[in-house]
Amino acid sequence: MNKFYPVLLMIFVFILFSLNTIAQTKFPQSPEKPDTFKVTNTINLEYKYVASINEQIQNGTFIPADPNEFKRQGPPKRMRANKVVPGKGLPKGDDPLVDFNLTKIKKQTREPILTFQTTNVTSTPSDPTGEVGRDYYLASWNSSFRFFNLDGSPATPAASLSSLFGPNESGDPIVLYDGEADRYVISSMGSSSLNFAVSVSNDPVNDGWHVYNAASNQFPTGGQFPDYPKYSIWSDGYYCTTNTGGDNLFVLEREKILIGDSSATLQSFDTPSMVQSGFASAQILDIVDDNHPEAGNATLVYLQDDSWGGVSYDHIKLWTVNVDWNNPANSSISNPTELATTAFNSVFDGGNFSNLQQPSGSDIDAVQATIMNQAQFRKFATHNSAVFNFVVDTDGTAGELAGIRWYELRQDGDGQPWTIFQEGTYIAPDGRHAFMGSMSMDLQGNIGMGYSSVSTSESVSLRYTGRYAADQLGEMTLEEGLITQSSANSNSFRYSDYAHLSVDPTNDKQFWFVGEYFSPNRSNMVGVFQIAADAAYDTGVVSVDSPVTGTLTDSESVTVSIFNYGENDISNFDVSFQVDGGAVVTET
Protein backbone atom coordinates (compact mmCIF):
# COMPACT_ATOMS: atom_id res chain seq x y z
CA MET A 1 0.00 0.00 0.00
CA ASN A 2 1.35 3.48 -0.92
CA LYS A 3 1.53 5.91 2.02
CA PHE A 4 3.37 9.08 3.02
CA TYR A 5 5.53 9.16 6.13
CA PRO A 6 6.61 12.53 7.65
CA VAL A 7 10.19 12.30 8.92
CA LEU A 8 12.20 14.85 10.97
CA LEU A 9 15.85 15.11 9.90
CA MET A 10 18.73 17.11 11.44
CA ILE A 11 20.80 18.36 8.53
CA PHE A 12 23.26 21.16 7.76
CA VAL A 13 22.33 22.75 4.42
CA PHE A 14 20.79 25.85 2.86
CA ILE A 15 17.38 25.07 1.39
CA LEU A 16 14.83 27.31 -0.32
CA PHE A 17 11.47 25.75 -1.07
CA SER A 18 8.01 27.10 -1.77
CA LEU A 19 5.07 24.71 -1.74
CA ASN A 20 1.51 25.60 -2.58
CA THR A 21 -1.51 23.37 -2.28
CA ILE A 22 -4.84 23.42 -4.03
CA ALA A 23 -8.03 22.11 -2.51
CA GLN A 24 -10.47 19.99 -4.44
CA THR A 25 -14.01 21.23 -4.47
CA LYS A 26 -16.82 18.71 -4.35
CA PHE A 27 -19.79 19.43 -6.55
CA PRO A 28 -23.34 18.15 -6.13
CA GLN A 29 -24.50 15.43 -8.46
CA SER A 30 -27.82 15.87 -10.24
CA PRO A 31 -29.06 12.47 -11.37
CA GLU A 32 -32.26 12.15 -13.32
CA LYS A 33 -34.45 9.10 -13.07
CA PRO A 34 -33.91 7.49 -16.48
CA ASP A 35 -36.63 6.60 -18.91
CA THR A 36 -35.69 4.10 -21.58
CA PHE A 37 -35.80 4.10 -25.37
CA LYS A 38 -35.96 0.99 -27.50
CA VAL A 39 -33.44 -0.34 -29.96
CA THR A 40 -33.77 1.37 -33.34
CA ASN A 41 -32.57 -1.37 -35.68
CA THR A 42 -31.40 -4.98 -35.67
CA ILE A 43 -29.53 -6.41 -38.66
CA ASN A 44 -27.75 -9.64 -39.51
CA LEU A 45 -24.00 -9.37 -39.92
CA GLU A 46 -22.25 -10.87 -42.94
CA TYR A 47 -19.61 -13.45 -41.97
CA LYS A 48 -16.51 -14.89 -43.60
CA TYR A 49 -13.45 -16.78 -42.42
CA VAL A 50 -10.10 -15.21 -43.34
CA ALA A 51 -6.79 -17.05 -43.19
CA SER A 52 -4.00 -15.93 -40.88
CA ILE A 53 -1.20 -13.63 -42.02
CA ASN A 54 1.24 -16.56 -42.20
CA GLU A 55 -1.25 -18.62 -44.23
CA GLN A 56 -1.81 -15.70 -46.60
CA ILE A 57 1.94 -15.31 -47.11
CA GLN A 58 2.27 -19.02 -47.86
CA ASN A 59 -0.62 -19.15 -50.34
CA GLY A 60 0.24 -15.87 -52.07
CA THR A 61 -2.87 -13.88 -51.07
CA PHE A 62 -1.17 -11.58 -48.57
CA ILE A 63 -1.70 -7.84 -49.17
CA PRO A 64 1.18 -5.86 -47.67
CA ALA A 65 0.80 -2.39 -46.23
CA ASP A 66 1.45 0.39 -48.71
CA PRO A 67 4.16 2.66 -47.25
CA ASN A 68 2.78 5.52 -49.37
CA GLU A 69 -0.84 4.87 -48.47
CA PHE A 70 -3.36 7.64 -48.44
CA LYS A 71 -6.57 6.93 -46.63
CA ARG A 72 -9.45 5.78 -48.78
CA GLN A 73 -11.93 8.19 -47.31
CA GLY A 74 -15.56 8.94 -47.72
CA PRO A 75 -16.55 12.41 -46.50
CA PRO A 76 -13.52 13.70 -44.58
CA LYS A 77 -13.93 13.25 -40.85
CA ARG A 78 -13.69 16.01 -38.27
CA MET A 79 -14.15 18.68 -40.91
CA ARG A 80 -17.31 20.37 -39.60
CA ALA A 81 -16.60 23.29 -37.28
CA ASN A 82 -18.14 23.02 -33.83
CA LYS A 83 -21.34 24.99 -33.25
CA VAL A 84 -20.58 27.15 -30.24
CA VAL A 85 -22.13 30.33 -28.86
CA PRO A 86 -19.45 33.06 -28.62
CA GLY A 87 -19.09 34.43 -25.10
CA LYS A 88 -21.35 31.79 -23.56
CA GLY A 89 -20.25 29.49 -20.76
CA LEU A 90 -17.94 29.23 -17.78
CA PRO A 91 -15.23 29.55 -16.65
CA LYS A 92 -14.54 33.18 -17.59
CA GLY A 93 -10.99 32.90 -16.29
CA ASP A 94 -8.38 30.14 -16.06
CA ASP A 95 -9.40 26.54 -15.56
CA PRO A 96 -10.21 26.33 -11.82
CA LEU A 97 -8.66 22.86 -11.40
CA VAL A 98 -5.22 23.77 -12.72
CA ASP A 99 -2.36 24.24 -10.32
CA PHE A 100 -0.29 26.74 -12.28
CA ASN A 101 2.52 26.51 -9.70
CA LEU A 102 4.49 23.95 -11.67
CA THR A 103 7.41 24.24 -9.24
CA LYS A 104 5.46 21.98 -6.89
CA ILE A 105 7.51 18.87 -6.22
CA LYS A 106 6.25 15.72 -7.93
CA LYS A 107 7.15 12.11 -7.41
CA GLN A 108 9.89 10.66 -9.55
CA THR A 109 8.85 9.01 -12.80
CA ARG A 110 10.66 5.93 -14.06
CA GLU A 111 12.20 5.96 -17.52
CA PRO A 112 10.26 4.09 -20.23
CA ILE A 113 10.75 0.35 -20.05
CA LEU A 114 10.59 -0.02 -23.83
CA THR A 115 10.05 2.17 -26.89
CA PHE A 116 9.64 1.08 -30.51
CA GLN A 117 8.26 2.50 -33.73
CA THR A 118 5.29 0.76 -35.37
CA THR A 119 5.19 2.63 -38.68
CA ASN A 120 6.50 5.52 -40.75
CA VAL A 121 3.89 6.68 -43.26
CA THR A 122 2.81 9.57 -45.46
CA SER A 123 -0.90 9.35 -44.66
CA THR A 124 -2.53 12.24 -42.82
CA PRO A 125 -3.30 11.66 -39.99
CA SER A 126 -1.89 8.26 -39.04
CA ASP A 127 -4.68 7.20 -36.61
CA PRO A 128 -2.44 5.35 -34.11
CA THR A 129 -4.04 2.50 -32.18
CA GLY A 130 -2.54 -0.50 -30.40
CA GLU A 131 -3.25 -3.01 -27.63
CA VAL A 132 -0.96 -5.31 -25.72
CA GLY A 133 -2.05 -8.93 -25.27
CA ARG A 134 -0.56 -11.92 -23.49
CA ASP A 135 1.68 -12.86 -26.41
CA TYR A 136 1.72 -9.98 -28.91
CA TYR A 137 1.30 -6.24 -29.29
CA LEU A 138 -1.21 -5.46 -32.05
CA ALA A 139 -0.63 -2.10 -33.76
CA SER A 140 -2.72 -0.47 -36.46
CA TRP A 141 -2.69 2.83 -38.30
CA ASN A 142 -4.62 4.42 -41.14
CA SER A 143 -5.24 1.38 -43.37
CA SER A 144 -2.71 -1.15 -42.07
CA PHE A 145 -1.83 -3.34 -39.08
CA ARG A 146 1.07 -5.37 -37.71
CA PHE A 147 1.83 -7.73 -34.84
CA PHE A 148 4.90 -7.24 -32.66
CA ASN A 149 6.53 -9.50 -30.10
CA LEU A 150 6.51 -8.14 -26.56
CA ASP A 151 10.15 -7.05 -26.91
CA GLY A 152 9.11 -4.69 -29.74
CA SER A 153 10.45 -6.81 -32.59
CA PRO A 154 8.11 -7.47 -35.55
CA ALA A 155 6.22 -10.78 -35.47
CA THR A 156 4.66 -10.28 -38.93
CA PRO A 157 5.09 -8.00 -41.92
CA ALA A 158 2.89 -4.91 -41.98
CA ALA A 159 -0.41 -5.88 -43.62
CA SER A 160 -3.12 -3.91 -45.36
CA LEU A 161 -6.50 -3.94 -43.63
CA SER A 162 -7.77 -5.10 -47.02
CA SER A 163 -6.16 -8.47 -46.27
CA LEU A 164 -8.97 -8.91 -43.73
CA PHE A 165 -11.82 -6.80 -45.04
CA GLY A 166 -11.32 -6.70 -48.80
CA PRO A 167 -11.87 -3.56 -50.89
CA ASN A 168 -14.67 -2.18 -48.67
CA GLU A 169 -12.18 -0.71 -46.21
CA SER A 170 -11.82 2.99 -45.41
CA GLY A 171 -9.38 3.11 -42.51
CA ASP A 172 -9.93 4.65 -39.07
CA PRO A 173 -8.92 1.40 -37.33
CA ILE A 174 -9.35 0.63 -33.65
CA VAL A 175 -7.78 -2.53 -32.23
CA LEU A 176 -8.62 -4.27 -28.96
CA TYR A 177 -7.46 -7.18 -26.86
CA ASP A 178 -10.33 -9.13 -25.30
CA GLY A 179 -8.65 -10.33 -22.11
CA GLU A 180 -11.44 -12.61 -20.93
CA ALA A 181 -11.51 -14.45 -24.27
CA ASP A 182 -7.74 -14.05 -24.95
CA ARG A 183 -8.48 -12.80 -28.49
CA TYR A 184 -7.32 -9.92 -30.67
CA VAL A 185 -9.79 -7.59 -32.38
CA ILE A 186 -9.35 -5.35 -35.44
CA SER A 187 -11.97 -2.92 -36.75
CA SER A 188 -12.24 -0.34 -39.51
CA MET A 189 -14.78 1.71 -41.40
CA GLY A 190 -16.42 0.66 -44.61
CA SER A 191 -17.82 3.16 -47.10
CA SER A 192 -21.11 3.22 -45.20
CA SER A 193 -20.67 0.24 -42.89
CA LEU A 194 -18.45 -1.23 -40.18
CA ASN A 195 -15.81 -3.96 -40.50
CA PHE A 196 -14.93 -6.15 -37.52
CA ALA A 197 -12.53 -9.09 -37.09
CA VAL A 198 -11.66 -11.25 -34.08
CA SER A 199 -8.86 -13.82 -34.02
CA VAL A 200 -9.97 -17.46 -34.04
CA SER A 201 -7.55 -18.23 -31.19
CA ASN A 202 -4.97 -16.54 -29.00
CA ASP A 203 -2.43 -17.03 -31.82
CA PRO A 204 -3.41 -14.41 -34.42
CA VAL A 205 -0.19 -14.88 -36.37
CA ASN A 206 -0.75 -18.53 -37.28
CA ASP A 207 -4.52 -18.94 -36.90
CA GLY A 208 -7.29 -17.26 -38.84
CA TRP A 209 -9.95 -14.62 -38.29
CA HIS A 210 -13.71 -14.44 -37.87
CA VAL A 211 -14.60 -11.42 -40.00
CA TYR A 212 -17.94 -9.61 -39.89
CA ASN A 213 -19.38 -6.75 -41.89
CA ALA A 214 -22.54 -4.69 -41.51
CA ALA A 215 -23.66 -4.58 -45.14
CA SER A 216 -23.92 -1.09 -46.60
CA ASN A 217 -27.47 -1.58 -47.82
CA GLN A 218 -28.57 -2.60 -44.31
CA PHE A 219 -26.38 -0.46 -42.08
CA PRO A 220 -28.69 1.84 -40.10
CA THR A 221 -27.10 5.24 -40.79
CA GLY A 222 -29.13 6.14 -43.86
CA GLY A 223 -26.05 5.91 -46.07
CA GLN A 224 -23.99 8.18 -43.83
CA PHE A 225 -20.27 7.59 -43.54
CA PRO A 226 -19.69 5.95 -40.09
CA ASP A 227 -17.31 8.70 -39.04
CA TYR A 228 -14.76 8.36 -36.22
CA PRO A 229 -15.81 4.93 -34.87
CA LYS A 230 -14.64 4.09 -31.35
CA TYR A 231 -14.95 0.55 -29.95
CA SER A 232 -15.23 -0.88 -26.44
CA ILE A 233 -15.52 -4.33 -24.90
CA TRP A 234 -18.37 -5.01 -22.50
CA SER A 235 -19.57 -8.29 -21.03
CA ASP A 236 -22.45 -8.75 -23.48
CA GLY A 237 -21.16 -7.10 -26.64
CA TYR A 238 -18.61 -5.21 -28.66
CA TYR A 239 -19.85 -1.61 -28.59
CA CYS A 240 -19.15 1.11 -31.18
CA THR A 241 -19.94 4.82 -31.27
CA THR A 242 -19.80 6.99 -34.40
CA ASN A 243 -20.09 10.66 -35.33
CA THR A 244 -23.34 10.28 -37.27
CA GLY A 245 -26.82 11.72 -37.13
CA GLY A 246 -29.59 9.35 -36.06
CA ASP A 247 -28.22 6.00 -34.97
CA ASN A 248 -24.77 6.54 -33.43
CA LEU A 249 -24.39 3.59 -31.05
CA PHE A 250 -23.96 0.04 -32.33
CA VAL A 251 -23.61 -3.25 -30.44
CA LEU A 252 -22.20 -6.43 -32.01
CA GLU A 253 -23.10 -9.85 -30.61
CA ARG A 254 -19.85 -10.76 -28.84
CA GLU A 255 -20.76 -14.31 -27.76
CA LYS A 256 -21.49 -15.45 -31.32
CA ILE A 257 -18.66 -13.48 -32.90
CA LEU A 258 -16.09 -15.21 -30.69
CA ILE A 259 -17.09 -18.62 -32.07
CA GLY A 260 -17.57 -17.52 -35.68
CA ASP A 261 -21.35 -17.95 -35.67
CA SER A 262 -22.77 -16.69 -38.97
CA SER A 263 -26.06 -15.73 -37.29
CA ALA A 264 -24.46 -12.93 -35.24
CA THR A 265 -26.41 -9.67 -35.27
CA LEU A 266 -25.94 -5.96 -34.66
CA GLN A 267 -28.29 -3.67 -32.74
CA SER A 268 -28.28 0.12 -33.08
CA PHE A 269 -29.52 3.02 -30.97
CA ASP A 270 -30.09 6.74 -31.33
CA THR A 271 -28.67 8.37 -28.20
CA PRO A 272 -31.39 10.52 -26.57
CA SER A 273 -30.74 14.07 -25.30
CA MET A 274 -27.11 14.19 -26.45
CA VAL A 275 -26.29 17.83 -27.19
CA GLN A 276 -23.61 18.11 -29.85
CA SER A 277 -21.43 20.96 -31.01
CA GLY A 278 -21.34 19.87 -34.65
CA PHE A 279 -18.97 16.97 -33.97
CA ALA A 280 -19.47 14.36 -31.25
CA SER A 281 -17.57 11.34 -30.01
CA ALA A 282 -19.02 9.64 -26.95
CA GLN A 283 -17.63 6.32 -25.67
CA ILE A 284 -18.91 3.20 -23.98
CA LEU A 285 -16.74 2.20 -21.01
CA ASP A 286 -14.18 -0.41 -22.08
CA ILE A 287 -13.21 -3.23 -19.69
CA VAL A 288 -9.47 -3.01 -18.96
CA ASP A 289 -8.81 -6.60 -17.91
CA ASP A 290 -10.40 -10.08 -17.81
CA ASN A 291 -12.53 -9.33 -14.73
CA HIS A 292 -15.89 -8.62 -16.32
CA PRO A 293 -18.95 -7.17 -14.60
CA GLU A 294 -22.36 -8.77 -14.90
CA ALA A 295 -23.86 -8.57 -18.39
CA GLY A 296 -25.93 -5.48 -19.10
CA ASN A 297 -25.80 -1.90 -17.86
CA ALA A 298 -23.09 -0.78 -20.26
CA THR A 299 -22.34 2.92 -19.69
CA LEU A 300 -22.03 5.55 -22.43
CA VAL A 301 -20.24 8.77 -21.43
CA TYR A 302 -20.01 12.22 -23.05
CA LEU A 303 -19.11 15.77 -22.03
CA GLN A 304 -21.59 18.65 -22.24
CA ASP A 305 -20.03 22.14 -22.42
CA ASP A 306 -22.09 25.21 -21.49
CA SER A 307 -20.29 27.04 -24.32
CA TRP A 308 -22.52 25.04 -26.66
CA GLY A 309 -26.05 26.01 -27.50
CA GLY A 310 -28.59 24.04 -25.49
CA VAL A 311 -26.29 23.34 -22.51
CA SER A 312 -26.90 25.41 -19.36
CA TYR A 313 -24.00 24.16 -17.20
CA ASP A 314 -20.88 22.03 -17.62
CA HIS A 315 -21.53 18.37 -16.89
CA ILE A 316 -20.98 14.75 -17.87
CA LYS A 317 -23.86 12.74 -19.30
CA LEU A 318 -24.16 9.00 -18.75
CA TRP A 319 -26.51 6.63 -20.56
CA THR A 320 -27.20 3.01 -19.56
CA VAL A 321 -27.51 0.46 -22.36
CA ASN A 322 -29.06 -2.99 -21.97
CA VAL A 323 -29.10 -5.46 -24.85
CA ASP A 324 -31.30 -8.54 -25.12
CA TRP A 325 -29.94 -10.71 -27.94
CA ASN A 326 -32.80 -13.21 -27.72
CA ASN A 327 -35.54 -10.60 -27.83
CA PRO A 328 -34.26 -7.30 -29.30
CA ALA A 329 -37.56 -5.61 -28.47
CA ASN A 330 -36.38 -5.66 -24.85
CA SER A 331 -33.12 -3.83 -25.62
CA SER A 332 -32.98 -0.25 -24.39
CA ILE A 333 -30.95 2.90 -23.81
CA SER A 334 -31.81 5.21 -20.93
CA ASN A 335 -32.32 8.91 -20.76
CA PRO A 336 -29.06 10.41 -19.49
CA THR A 337 -27.99 10.94 -15.92
CA GLU A 338 -26.15 14.24 -15.44
CA LEU A 339 -23.09 14.68 -13.20
CA ALA A 340 -22.24 18.33 -12.51
CA THR A 341 -18.53 19.11 -12.93
CA THR A 342 -16.14 21.91 -12.13
CA ALA A 343 -16.44 24.47 -14.94
CA PHE A 344 -14.39 23.75 -18.06
CA ASN A 345 -13.91 25.25 -21.52
CA SER A 346 -13.51 22.62 -24.23
CA VAL A 347 -13.71 25.13 -27.12
CA PHE A 348 -10.69 26.23 -29.14
CA ASP A 349 -10.72 28.98 -31.77
CA GLY A 350 -14.50 29.27 -31.78
CA GLY A 351 -14.81 25.59 -32.57
CA ASN A 352 -12.54 25.45 -35.61
CA PHE A 353 -9.94 22.72 -36.01
CA SER A 354 -6.69 24.70 -36.46
CA ASN A 355 -5.70 25.25 -32.86
CA LEU A 356 -2.25 24.58 -31.42
CA GLN A 357 0.87 26.35 -32.67
CA GLN A 358 4.04 24.49 -33.63
CA PRO A 359 7.48 26.04 -34.17
CA SER A 360 6.47 26.25 -37.85
CA GLY A 361 3.72 24.96 -40.11
CA SER A 362 -0.02 24.72 -39.57
CA ASP A 363 -1.72 25.05 -36.21
CA ILE A 364 -2.77 21.48 -35.38
CA ASP A 365 -6.12 20.08 -34.31
CA ALA A 366 -6.61 19.76 -30.54
CA VAL A 367 -9.49 17.27 -31.17
CA GLN A 368 -12.12 19.05 -29.10
CA ALA A 369 -15.63 17.84 -28.15
CA THR A 370 -14.30 14.29 -27.88
CA ILE A 371 -14.03 11.70 -25.12
CA MET A 372 -10.53 10.58 -25.97
CA ASN A 373 -9.76 6.97 -26.78
CA GLN A 374 -10.60 5.14 -24.50
CA ALA A 375 -12.95 5.49 -21.54
CA GLN A 376 -11.79 2.63 -19.30
CA PHE A 377 -13.58 0.47 -16.69
CA ARG A 378 -12.06 -1.68 -13.94
CA LYS A 379 -13.61 -3.75 -11.13
CA PHE A 380 -12.06 -3.63 -7.66
CA ALA A 381 -13.01 -5.52 -4.51
CA THR A 382 -14.90 -2.57 -3.01
CA HIS A 383 -16.06 -0.58 -6.05
CA ASN A 384 -15.94 -0.15 -9.82
CA SER A 385 -13.94 2.70 -11.40
CA ALA A 386 -14.08 4.44 -14.77
CA VAL A 387 -11.48 6.90 -16.09
CA PHE A 388 -11.61 9.13 -19.17
CA ASN A 389 -10.39 12.51 -20.44
CA PHE A 390 -10.93 15.31 -22.96
CA VAL A 391 -8.99 18.40 -24.00
CA VAL A 392 -9.74 21.84 -22.51
CA ASP A 393 -8.43 25.38 -22.94
CA THR A 394 -7.00 26.24 -19.52
CA ASP A 395 -6.03 29.84 -20.38
CA GLY A 396 -8.73 32.37 -19.46
CA THR A 397 -7.18 35.12 -21.62
CA ALA A 398 -7.28 35.52 -25.39
CA GLY A 399 -4.41 33.05 -25.58
CA GLU A 400 -4.72 29.27 -25.46
CA LEU A 401 -3.10 26.57 -23.37
CA ALA A 402 -4.38 23.05 -23.98
CA GLY A 403 -4.70 20.86 -20.93
CA ILE A 404 -6.33 17.53 -20.20
CA ARG A 405 -9.46 17.42 -18.04
CA TRP A 406 -9.67 13.92 -16.57
CA TYR A 407 -12.14 12.05 -14.38
CA GLU A 408 -12.45 9.00 -12.21
CA LEU A 409 -16.04 7.90 -11.63
CA ARG A 410 -16.99 5.26 -9.08
CA GLN A 411 -19.95 3.01 -8.41
CA ASP A 412 -20.50 0.74 -5.39
CA GLY A 413 -21.21 -2.29 -7.58
CA ASP A 414 -22.36 -3.46 -11.01
CA GLY A 415 -25.35 -1.48 -12.25
CA GLN A 416 -25.23 1.02 -9.36
CA PRO A 417 -25.24 4.82 -9.88
CA TRP A 418 -22.01 6.52 -10.88
CA THR A 419 -20.59 9.53 -9.00
CA ILE A 420 -17.52 11.68 -9.56
CA PHE A 421 -14.77 10.41 -7.25
CA GLN A 422 -12.12 12.82 -8.53
CA GLU A 423 -11.55 15.31 -11.34
CA GLY A 424 -8.47 17.22 -12.37
CA THR A 425 -6.93 19.28 -15.15
CA TYR A 426 -3.38 18.44 -16.18
CA ILE A 427 -1.06 20.92 -17.89
CA ALA A 428 2.46 20.24 -19.12
CA PRO A 429 5.57 22.06 -17.86
CA ASP A 430 7.36 24.82 -19.79
CA GLY A 431 4.18 26.32 -21.27
CA ARG A 432 3.63 23.41 -23.65
CA HIS A 433 0.18 22.20 -24.67
CA ALA A 434 -0.96 18.81 -23.33
CA PHE A 435 -3.61 17.08 -25.44
CA MET A 436 -4.52 13.83 -27.27
CA GLY A 437 -4.59 11.96 -23.97
CA SER A 438 -5.26 8.29 -23.33
CA MET A 439 -5.48 6.84 -19.82
CA SER A 440 -6.17 3.71 -17.80
CA MET A 441 -5.76 2.11 -14.36
CA ASP A 442 -3.53 -0.74 -13.21
CA LEU A 443 -4.40 -3.48 -10.73
CA GLN A 444 -3.61 -1.22 -7.75
CA GLY A 445 -5.77 1.66 -8.93
CA ASN A 446 -2.82 3.79 -10.07
CA ILE A 447 -3.66 5.92 -13.12
CA GLY A 448 -1.32 6.19 -16.12
CA MET A 449 -1.82 8.73 -18.88
CA GLY A 450 0.00 9.19 -22.19
CA TYR A 451 -0.43 12.36 -24.24
CA SER A 452 0.98 14.63 -26.92
CA SER A 453 2.69 17.96 -26.23
CA VAL A 454 3.71 20.88 -28.47
CA SER A 455 4.58 24.58 -28.23
CA THR A 456 5.82 27.45 -30.38
CA SER A 457 9.40 26.46 -29.55
CA GLU A 458 9.12 22.67 -29.34
CA SER A 459 7.82 20.18 -31.93
CA VAL A 460 5.34 17.48 -31.03
CA SER A 461 6.50 15.03 -28.38
CA LEU A 462 4.90 11.98 -26.77
CA ARG A 463 4.90 12.03 -22.98
CA TYR A 464 3.33 10.43 -19.93
CA THR A 465 2.39 11.08 -16.33
CA GLY A 466 0.23 9.46 -13.68
CA ARG A 467 -0.70 9.15 -10.03
CA TYR A 468 -0.72 6.61 -7.23
CA ALA A 469 -4.08 5.47 -5.92
CA ALA A 470 -3.40 6.95 -2.46
CA ASP A 471 -2.30 10.38 -3.72
CA GLN A 472 -4.20 13.61 -3.13
CA LEU A 473 -7.33 13.54 -5.26
CA GLY A 474 -7.44 15.47 -8.53
CA GLU A 475 -3.69 15.60 -9.19
CA MET A 476 -1.33 13.87 -11.58
CA THR A 477 1.47 13.61 -9.03
CA LEU A 478 4.22 12.01 -11.13
CA GLU A 479 6.86 13.96 -13.02
CA GLU A 480 6.36 14.15 -16.76
CA GLY A 481 8.17 11.38 -18.66
CA LEU A 482 9.36 11.56 -22.27
CA ILE A 483 8.74 8.78 -24.80
CA THR A 484 9.97 10.51 -27.97
CA GLN A 485 10.59 13.96 -29.43
CA SER A 486 9.79 14.85 -33.05
CA SER A 487 12.51 16.01 -35.42
CA ALA A 488 10.05 17.86 -37.68
CA ASN A 489 6.67 19.61 -37.64
CA SER A 490 3.33 18.66 -39.14
CA ASN A 491 2.62 20.06 -42.60
CA SER A 492 -1.13 19.79 -41.97
CA PHE A 493 -3.57 20.83 -39.27
CA ARG A 494 -4.64 17.17 -39.13
CA TYR A 495 -2.75 15.40 -36.37
CA SER A 496 -3.15 11.87 -35.00
CA ASP A 497 -6.99 12.02 -34.47
CA TYR A 498 -6.53 9.73 -31.44
CA ALA A 499 -3.97 7.85 -29.36
CA HIS A 500 -4.24 4.60 -27.42
CA LEU A 501 -3.08 3.34 -24.02
CA SER A 502 -3.58 -0.23 -22.78
CA VAL A 503 -2.50 -2.29 -19.75
CA ASP A 504 -0.29 -5.38 -20.06
CA PRO A 505 -2.41 -8.43 -19.06
CA THR A 506 0.67 -10.45 -18.09
CA ASN A 507 1.41 -8.28 -15.04
CA ASP A 508 -1.54 -5.81 -14.95
CA LYS A 509 0.98 -3.04 -14.21
CA GLN A 510 2.67 -1.84 -17.39
CA PHE A 511 1.02 0.87 -19.52
CA TRP A 512 1.58 0.64 -23.29
CA PHE A 513 0.96 3.98 -25.05
CA VAL A 514 1.08 4.69 -28.78
CA GLY A 515 0.84 8.11 -30.42
CA GLU A 516 1.90 10.09 -33.48
CA TYR A 517 5.13 12.03 -33.91
CA PHE A 518 7.38 13.14 -36.81
CA SER A 519 10.72 11.52 -37.66
CA PRO A 520 10.54 13.43 -40.06
CA ASN A 521 7.52 11.69 -41.66
CA ARG A 522 4.42 10.91 -39.64
CA SER A 523 5.32 7.97 -37.43
CA ASN A 524 3.84 6.07 -34.53
CA MET A 525 5.85 5.29 -31.41
CA VAL A 526 5.01 2.93 -28.54
CA GLY A 527 6.22 3.76 -25.06
CA VAL A 528 5.91 1.32 -22.15
CA PHE A 529 5.97 2.68 -18.60
CA GLN A 530 5.03 1.49 -15.13
CA ILE A 531 3.88 3.15 -11.92
CA ALA A 532 3.27 0.22 -9.56
CA ALA A 533 6.29 -1.18 -7.76
CA ASP A 534 7.71 -4.62 -8.42
CA ALA A 535 9.49 -4.60 -5.05
CA ALA A 536 7.80 -5.47 -1.78
CA TYR A 537 9.68 -2.66 0.01
CA ASP A 538 10.75 0.54 -1.72
CA THR A 539 10.73 4.04 -0.18
CA GLY A 540 11.92 7.47 -1.28
CA VAL A 541 11.87 11.16 -0.29
CA VAL A 542 9.34 13.11 -2.36
CA SER A 543 9.27 16.57 -0.72
CA VAL A 544 10.77 18.85 1.91
CA ASP A 545 7.82 20.10 3.96
CA SER A 546 9.41 22.50 6.45
CA PRO A 547 10.98 24.92 6.49
CA VAL A 548 9.88 25.96 3.01
CA THR A 549 11.72 29.32 2.87
CA GLY A 550 14.67 31.01 4.52
CA THR A 551 18.28 30.23 5.35
CA LEU A 552 19.06 27.30 7.59
CA THR A 553 21.29 27.62 10.62
CA ASP A 554 24.15 25.29 11.51
CA SER A 555 21.65 23.01 13.23
CA GLU A 556 18.13 22.92 11.86
CA SER A 557 15.06 20.70 12.02
CA VAL A 558 13.88 19.77 8.55
CA THR A 559 10.76 17.72 7.88
CA VAL A 560 10.50 15.69 4.70
CA SER A 561 7.83 13.39 3.30
CA ILE A 562 8.76 9.85 2.40
CA PHE A 563 6.60 7.82 0.04
CA ASN A 564 6.19 4.07 0.14
CA TYR A 565 6.58 2.97 -3.48
CA GLY A 566 6.55 -0.70 -2.48
CA GLU A 567 3.72 -3.20 -2.37
CA ASN A 568 3.78 -3.84 1.40
CA ASP A 569 3.11 -1.57 4.38
CA ILE A 570 6.20 -0.54 6.35
CA SER A 571 6.87 1.05 9.75
CA ASN A 572 9.78 1.76 12.13
CA PHE A 573 12.25 2.05 9.26
CA ASP A 574 15.61 3.88 9.11
CA VAL A 575 16.22 6.90 6.87
CA SER A 576 19.70 7.65 5.54
CA PHE A 577 20.73 10.87 3.80
CA GLN A 578 23.79 12.66 2.51
CA VAL A 579 24.30 16.41 1.94
CA ASP A 580 26.81 17.85 -0.52
CA GLY A 581 28.92 14.71 -0.55
CA GLY A 582 29.32 14.66 3.21
CA ALA A 583 29.02 11.76 5.57
CA VAL A 584 25.99 9.51 5.34
CA VAL A 585 23.67 10.12 8.29
CA THR A 586 21.09 7.58 9.41
CA GLU A 587 17.99 8.55 11.39
CA THR A 588 16.09 5.80 13.18
Please place each PLM-identified region on the residue numbering.
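Bacterial Sec-dependent N-terminal signal peptides
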Residues: 1-28, 555
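Detector for intrinsically disordered, low-structure N-terminal pre-sequences
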Residues: 6, 12-14, 38, 49, ...
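Intrinsically disordered, low-complexity segments enriched in glycine/proline and serine/threonine
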Residues: 6, 80, 439, 559-560
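Prokaryotic Sec-type signal peptides and long signal-anchor helices
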Residues: 8, 16-21, 66, 74, ...
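Compositionally biased regions
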Residues: 19, 161-163, 485-491, 544-547, ...
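C-terminal PAP-associated
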Residues: 24-534
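Extracellular/luminal regions of secreted and cell-surface proteins that mediate adhesion/ECM remodeling
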Residues: 534-588
